[in-house]
């Protein structure tokens, strides 16, 4: 099988790509991309694994499925491409970021700089039909991303897992909480942010944990201007 993830995640996940469930998912996706408008672009499906290698992952921010509007999703949870309006959940993340660690909000939602510092921005489902949230749930992606979470949890170097909302928090069963740090809060969506997301201080808590592991803290301040890599 020719590698289609070009980092050490390939070795971690390759056994999954050889299993029947993934072959079924692959056939489903081929038909979906051929006949419908699917996000993200097929070349960006595994972008989170490309930008944040397994050995470099220090933090995981878990999402559900990609944004389902045109031109938003590019393979990272919560992140959108430059030139697209910042989605409401990310607006609230920026509010908490400013309140927690004093970061100045930016007018884009492109979280590449976090990913390149070791923040794995992982959705549990990696594709979605345009305009239809959760349309690719239950097709097999969850099995693959659950394995990614488990392998990180088992790693000798600990990881900070940030779980926002009920769906993300259900993944705690995959994580060894004795050796890793888990930060839980309500989802940053406008529907739930006031129930405890605001004031949860995930960014400062993450950096305290990383420092205790002997790791470099994350610089959460996003650049004011971003350029797409080609």
UniProtKB/Swiss-Prot annotation:
Q: Do the record's keywords include Zinc?
A: no
A Gene Ontology BP annotation from the UniProt entry: base-excision repair, AP site formation via deaminated base removal
Catalyzed chemical reaction(s): Hydrolyzes single-stranded DNA or mismatched double-stranded DNA and polynucleotides, releasing free uracil
Q: One MF term from GO for this chain?
A: uracil DNA N-glycosylase activity
One GO cellular-component annotation of the UniProt record comes to: cytoplasm
InterPro entries with a match to the protein in the record: UDG_fam1, Ura-DNA_Glyclase_AS, Uracil-DNA_glycosylase-like, Uracil-DNA_glycosylase-like_sf
CDD domains per the UniProt record, alphabetical? UDG-F1-like (cd10027)
Q: Name the keywords, alphabetized.
A: Cytoplasm, DNA damage, DNA repair, Hydrolase
Q: Which domain of life is it from?
A: Bacteria
Cellular location(s): Cytoplasm
What does the record give as EC number? 3.2.2.27
Q: Which PANTHER family does the entry link to?
A: URACIL-DNA GLYCOSYLASE (PTHR11264:SF0)
Membership in a protein family: Belongs to the uracil-DNA glycosylase (UDG) superfamily. UNG family.
Function statement? Excises uracil residues from the DNA which can arise as a result of misincorporation of dUMP residues by DNA polymerase or due to deamination of cytosine.
Per its record, how is this protein called by name? Answer: Uracil-DNA glycosylase
């Amino acid at each position: 099988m020719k590698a289609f993830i070009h980092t050490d995640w390939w070795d971690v996940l390759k056994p999954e790509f050889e299993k029947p469930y993934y072959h079924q998912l692959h056939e489903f996706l081929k038909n979906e991309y051929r006949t419908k408008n699917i996000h993200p672009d097929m070349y960006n499906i595994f972008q989170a694994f490309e930008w944040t290698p397994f050995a470099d992952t220090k933090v995981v921010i878990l999402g559900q499925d990609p944004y389902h509007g045109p031109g938003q999703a590019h393979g990272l949870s919560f992140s959108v491409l430059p030139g697209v309006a910042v989605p409401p959940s990310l607006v609230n993340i920026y509010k908490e970021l400013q309140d927690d660690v004093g970061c100045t909000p930016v007018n884009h939602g492109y979280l590449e700089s976090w990913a390149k510092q070791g923040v794995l921005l992982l959705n549990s489902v990696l594709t979605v039909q345009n305009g239809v949230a959760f349309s690719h749930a239950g097709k097999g992606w969850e099995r693959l991303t659950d394995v990614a979470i488990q392998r990180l949890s088992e790693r000798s170097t600990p990881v900070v897992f940030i779980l926002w909302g009920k769906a993300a928090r259900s993944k705690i069963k995959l994580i060894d909480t004795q050796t890793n740090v888990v930060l839980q809060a309500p989802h940053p969506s406008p529907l739930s942010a006031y129930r405890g997301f605001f004031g949860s201080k995930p960014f400062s808590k993450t950096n305290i944990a990383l420092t205790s592991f002997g790791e470099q803290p994350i610089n959460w301040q996003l650049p004011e201007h971003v350029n797409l890599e080609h």
